[in-house]
Amino acid sequence: KLLLSYATTGFTATTFGQAVEEVKRMRAWRLSDEPIADDEDEHLKDPAARAKVKATIFLGCTSNLVSAGTRETIRWLLEHRKVDCLVTTGGGIEEDLMKCLAPHYMGDFALKGAELRAKGINRIGNLLVPNRSYCLFEDWLTPMLDEMLDEQNAAASRVAKGEPGAEPFFFSPSSMIKRMGEKIDNKDSILYWAAKNDIPIFCPA
């Protein structure tokens, strides 16, 4: 009721209330709500089958949302299968994994970046990330990338030898991200739950 009341609160709360209504409509939609099209697949003309077809829900987020506490909300949505796929930036992937390896700290927007940098600390808004966090991330990621390259090369070698059934194999960004989610083994992670629940993550940037 609180969220719905925003629609009549005024200012930007109104658009938030409208967004709540749109999310409700998106989650409630079924193909059975729509008239049957002339070119509809035969199996989708069955009312029972149409009632089972839901909207495919994409969630898009930028890296700053993962750097901040919003990460926990995004993780919850994937853990409980509230979305069908996630679209994020490279920073969104990196920040999620880095938080599994070492904590970020609360700071202040007024802290001087140059002074922090001299101490080996990076600032994201009012969040502080020690250089060590990036080192830990690199140490964790590099062996996995080497392993993935070995898998691709092994597949290419089998093809070159003409082995029966051999096919070239390449990691797509989504399959790389899924492997990271499988390897991180941390229930606080967005990538962990995406991999566990087979929810694809697309990273065009």
Language-model regions, residue ranges each:
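Conserved catalytic alpha/beta core of Sir2/sirtuin-type deacylases, generalized to analogous enzyme cores
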Residues: 1-205
